């Protein structure tokens, strides 16, 4: 028989375990390093610098291009290497490289003549002379497989490096908009200001940092807000000038994917084309107006057509007004009020009979809508400082509330 005893504080322990696991997961995410994006420097792996680090990018491009040219130079040396041939020396023959003498080639490449006395295996002191006809050398000399594989590897390696370097140079020099570069600049700025806020809230350790007045050299208190701001700014600048941060950017930065990069580039190109077409339309309209103003005779026919249509329109308007005026006499007119009140609270004089009797300047000065809105609106804004949440410490019932304004202090009132 067994007795089960539940552990004390089970709920608190599980909550603490979950919070600790979440905190460890956040730390692991922060410590994870992402390879910086690039188009032609992917062979360098994690050594690729940040997209906005132009000196680092050009340094890697130079090294990569130099290695590519060296590979092509080695390929050229292999192609210039002459084919092997055997030279008889004494009682054995050795495999050596060299070109046949020009006097051995007769009638182009049809045959080769060699004097018998030049062969060392025969009698050197013989007075007999004759010619031996040899086969002409092949147009494409035979080579070993090792030499062919070396040529293939050097050619592919050099071409790959140079093409990748050219692709990266195109991205840096010919693209007017680079999403990766803009993203890295914004990430650096955010990191810089976040470090200022973090160091300001951390405060100053008097045992490590001492602040003195620049004028007289007297030590200053580290609890002054201005001193804390200056020290936080200096610490953030020192961290931003770190060689690793300058090369890679913020270490926790996760770059955008290549698909998102292409989407932003496509959107930028579409917007550029839209504004380009809009500017072309505006320029064409300006040219058309200038041509009409400078050449009135060429556009006289068009202006005459416009004037005729305008005259017809005015005649139609006059006929309609005359019809309304004649029909208004037969209809009983409504009783007019002594004063007219509009929906916006504008009171017109009693002698106002039509829109032509309204003095717009006077009405505007008396009933300015923006001034009315300013007088009817009253705003009261108060700023409350924010606090950093803590992942390790959980609030208890014994904790005292922090001094400061309550949420009711933030008010936004509107009075009429």
From Swiss-Prot:
Q: How does it sit in the membrane?
A: Multi-pass membrane protein
Q: Which of UniProt's keywords are assigned here?
A: Membrane, Mitochondrion, Mitochondrion inner membrane, Transmembrane, Transmembrane helix
Composition bias, Basic and acidic residues:
15-28
Chief location: mitochondrion
Q: Which residues lie on this side of the membrane: Mitochondrial intermembrane?
A: 1-56, 170-416
Renumbered residue ranges of the record's region Disordered: 1-28, 390-416
Q: Which GO terms describe its cellular component?
A: mitochondrial inner membrane
> Carries keyword S-adenosyl-L-methionine?
no
Mitochondrial matrix topological domain ranges are 74-151
Q: Where is the composition biased (Polar residues)?
A: 390-400
Cell compartments where the protein resides: Mitochondrion inner membrane
Listed transmembrane segments? 57-73, 152-169
On assembly, the entry states: Component of the mitochondrial inner membrane i-AAA protease complex composed of at least MRG1 and YME1. Interacts directly with YME1.
Its biological purpose is as follows: Component of the mitochondrial inner membrane i-AAA protease complex required for mitochondrial inner membrane protein turnover. Required for growth of cells lacking the mitochondrial genome.
Q: Which family does it belong to?
A: Belongs to the MGR1 family.
Can you name this protein?
Answer: Mitochondrial inner membrane i-AAA protease complex subunit MGR1
Q: What organism does this protein naturally occur in? A: Saccharomyces cerevisiae (strain YJM789) (Baker's yeast)
Gene that produces this protein: MGR1
């Amino acid at each position: 028989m067994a007795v089960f005893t539940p552990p004390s504080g089970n709920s608190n322990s599980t909550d603490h375990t979950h919070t600790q696991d979440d905190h460890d997961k956040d730390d692991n995410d922060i410590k994870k390093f992402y390879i910086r994006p690039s188009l032609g420097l992917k062979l360098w792996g994690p050594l690729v610098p940040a997209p906005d680090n132009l000196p680092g990018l050009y340094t890697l491009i130079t090294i990569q291009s130099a290695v590519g040219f060296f590979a092509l130079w080695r390929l050229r040396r292999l192609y210039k290497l002459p084919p092997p041939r055997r030279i008889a020396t004494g009682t054995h023959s050795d495999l050596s490289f060299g070109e046949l003498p020009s006097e051995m080639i007769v009638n182009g490449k049809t045959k080769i003549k060699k004097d018998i006395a030049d062969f060392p295996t025969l009698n050197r002191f013989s007075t007999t002379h004759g010619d031996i006809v040899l086969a002409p050398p092949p147009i494409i000399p035979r080579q070993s497989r090792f030499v062919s594989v070396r040529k293939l590897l050097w050619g592919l390696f050099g071409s790959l490096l140079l093409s990748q370097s050219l692709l990266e140079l195109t991205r840096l020099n010919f693209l007017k908009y680079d999403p990766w570069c803009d993203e890295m600049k914004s990430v650096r700025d955010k990191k810089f200001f976040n470090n200022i806020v973090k160091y300001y809230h951390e405060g100053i350790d008097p045992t490590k940092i001492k602040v003195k007045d620049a004028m007289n050299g007297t030590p200053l208190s580290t609890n002054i807000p201005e001193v804390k701001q200056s020290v936080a700014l200096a610490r953030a600048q020192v961290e931003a000038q770190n060689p690793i941060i300058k090369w890679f950017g913020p270490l926790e930065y996760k770059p955008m994917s290549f698909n998102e990069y292409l989407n932003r580039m496509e959107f930028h190109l579409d917007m550029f084309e839209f504004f380009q077409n809009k500017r072309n339309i505006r320029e064409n309209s300006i040219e058309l107006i200038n041509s009409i103003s400078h050449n009135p005779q060429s556009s006289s026919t068009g202006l005459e057509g416009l004037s005729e249509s305008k005259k017809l329109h005015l005649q139609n308007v006059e006929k309609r007004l005359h019809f309304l005026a004649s029909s208004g006499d037969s209809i009983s007119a409504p009783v007019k009020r002594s004063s007219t009140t509009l929906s916006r609270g504008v009171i017109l004089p009693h002698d106002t009979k039509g829109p032509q009797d309204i003095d717009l300047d006077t009405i505007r000065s008396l009933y300015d809508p923006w001034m009315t809105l300013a007088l009817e609106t009253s705003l009261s804004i108060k700023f409350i400082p924010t606090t950093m949440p803590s992942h390790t410490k959980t609030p208890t019932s014994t904790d005292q509330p922090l001094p400061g304004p309550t949420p009711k202090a933030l008010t936004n009132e509107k009075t009429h």
